[in-house]
Amino acid sequence: MLASLVALASCAHDDIGRAPRPVPSWLFYPREIWRLISPPPGEMPSPARPGGQVERFHPVDFAEPVRAVPPPQHPFMAANPGSNMHDDASMTDTAAAPGPLGIDPEIVTRSEGFGGYGTMAFDRKKRLVGVYGNGREFWVQLLDAHTLVKLASYSLPPRPWSFPLEGVAPWKYIGAGMYFYLDERDRAVVPTTENSIEVVQIPDDPASGIRSVRSYDLHEHVVKLDWPQRDSVAWVLPEWNGRRYWYATTSGMVGTVDVETGAIAELRLAGDAGPEIVENSFAVGEDGIFIASDRALYRFSAGANGEVVTDWRTPYDRGPAMKPGLISRGTGTSVSLVGGTDGLVVITDNAEPRIHVLFVRRSDGALGCSEPLFGDGQSATDVSAVELEHADRAGAPTGEFSAIVENNWSSGSFPVSNPEPGLTRVDAIREPDGGYRCKTVWTNPTRGINVAKASLGAGLLYTYFRDPADAVTQWYLSAVDLTSGETVYRVRAGAGQGFNNWAGSLFLHPDGGAFYTTTIFGMVMVRDAPAG
């Protein structure tokens, strides 16, 4: 396996305009190869065949569209749901368009060797914009969303050759543009390995190339660590009025950058127990910036000169230790917003024996309600929850909010994860007195470590993972009914480690009908066959 990784990582990156190489379908462990050569009696695994096979548990029309209040459109980010890893400034991981229904599915893949795409966004022409990385080198790429052909590429700063000494494995590294966003002018705003913010223009005509239009140097405004450790600017998002970029680093520095002047203000996160770190992306609302550290949830705003002002701080139960399968101790979810400025902030804690989903008031940081998740002693999450605000037939808010959380409590290590099963939907319901009550609506035994996505137009939640019951590793896109929690269908994407998406995110095309996911060897698209 290691030899295969090294060989494939050396693939060239000069394939602009060419048909993409497919994701390799032959990356199996020795025990799997033996099983393929000598299968037990009655067993005939055929993993090398192309994907697209459907296993259906309910009719195509089983799920119905879900009525929801759309998240607000940030005026300085690309159109929802195509601006960043979590689709919008509220980080809801939802889209209005209908997702694929499993009708004669087609599988399209691309690979450049070992490496993948942390985030995929969609420009005004609905082309894919992504940051591709192989653990050391990184590129902004423009891809055709239907063929996955590379149209243009821009090289970003690499990690230094000393990066293995930092102790952060490539599959745990969250810098270098993994969390870039696309702005309203089709510019990718990318935090780089040099602790800068690089603003690069995506061209209307790919022949003119991707080019840098502005850079902001933040290397003096991060936490200073002893060599070889390095702090990383991992997240950057625009303030609602567009005057400033807000950034956060993995070692707990939060700051603002004046878009015009480049002036920088910073604040090191710390509480009574000492310095805090950040391991998850943050959300932006009209009322402030919402960031979770490994100890507390914050709302920030900018002072008159850009200084970071703490509006409120809400501690949560970070648990006794980092749990199996997670990368840090503390909340594992990105911060998400539902409702308007009188709505809620959603995260999870890291409590034992069970974690809780927390619905926190945006206005003052007070806990609205919480609900325990999953089984005792095997309860954890390390990916963003999916959130939505329900609406009535007229489109008006009903005062009901949903969060869908995935269980990532896991044994194993890269590239094999063995998470405990569990997807759970919890609703927070606003009471007449303004309080909230939480209730568990459904639980589904699906396993996964991916960033799931909801299609409101199809009424489906989509996840991507392997089936532990398979004789050799096979990967599936599964669709779960948002209302009942029942699995509607699953489609086989492919087999072997080439199709392993290792905690990657799913992305729905803005027009619907097609889902994309990164893998550790590239990208996979699953779409319904075109009508007619």
Question: Which residues make up each language-model segment?
Answer:
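Residue-level detector of Asp-centered blade-edge/turn motifs that repeat once per structural unit
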Residues: 123-125, 182-185, 239-242, 284-286, ...
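Sequence/structural signature of beta-propeller modules
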Residues: 7-159, 185-187, 529-532
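Asp-box/WD-like beta-propeller blade repeats and closely related beta-sheet repeat scaffolds
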Residues: 160-177, 194-196, 202-240, 249-251, ...
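Blade-level signature of beta-propeller repeat domains, shared across WD40, Kelch, NHL, RCC1
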Residues: 500-532
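Surface-exposed loop and turn segments in beta-propeller and other repeat-based domains
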Residues: 97-103, 154-171, 213-229, 270-275, ...
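Loop/turn-rich, solvent-exposed surfaces of beta-rich toroidal or solenoidal domains
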Residues: 344-347, 386-497
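Repeated scaffold domains used in trafficking and secretory/extracellular systems
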Residues: 112-122, 160-181, 222-238, 274-285, ...
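Structural motif
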Residues: 135-145, 194-205, 251-258, 295-301, ...
